[in-house]
């Protein structure tokens, strides 16, 4: 099963304490606050409730912004179907995907906690959150694809 994000957004704490609403997901810090990125999928993950999830693969594209060299995107699961009113909260770290600007790559997720939390309905999306500094700053496309392998 393949799911595409409905949209991506960035919550900026420490300066604006609000969502950027420009269609990108960002991490790190680059003058406009501590950036935490999210991809939202609406209720798409609810179709997987009760299934045995064996593998998840998320494909991410890094846009221009910040250093052009590779930055480690720290991918985490979250339980929000859409943009919350305040800062997002994350559940479990899925892994790190290193991308330079203009690159697209796929992170395989086999963390048993995340797989079981997708099945139980607790995980509804993914995001990126790393150290809040310029060396970890990255801007990603709001459009990501999640491929999920499961059995009934």
Predicted regions and their residues:
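Hydrophobic beta-strand residues in large extracellular and virion-surface proteins
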Residues: 3, 53-60, 71-75, 107, ...
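Flexible, small-residue-rich N-terminal segments that precede or flank a structured functional core
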Residues: 1-45, 79, 119, 129-133, ...
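Hydrophobic alpha-helical elements and their junctions with loops/disorder across both membrane
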Residues: 63, 84-86
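Short, surface-exposed beta-strand/strand-loop-strand elements in extracellular ectodomains
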Residues: 68-83
């Amino acid at each position: 099963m393949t799911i595409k994000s409905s949209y991506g957004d960035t919550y900026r704490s420490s300066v604006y304490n609000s969502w950027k609403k420009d269609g990108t997901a960002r991490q790190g810090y680059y003058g406009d606050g501590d950036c935490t990125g999210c991809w939202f999928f609406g209720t798409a993950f609810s179709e997987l409730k009760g299934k045995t999830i064996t593998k998840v693969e998320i494909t991410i594209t890094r846009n221009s912004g910040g250093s052009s060299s590779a930055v480690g995107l720290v991918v985490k699961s979250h339980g929000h179907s859409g943009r919350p009113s305040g800062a997002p909260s994350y559940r479990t770290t899925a892994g790190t995907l290193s991308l330079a600007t203009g690159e697209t790559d796929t992170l395989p997720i086999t963390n048993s906690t995340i797989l079981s939390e997708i099945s139980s309905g607790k995980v509804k999306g993914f995001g990126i959150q790393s150290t809040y500094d310029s060396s970890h700053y990255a801007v990603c496309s709001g459009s990501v694809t999640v491929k999920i392998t499961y059995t009934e």
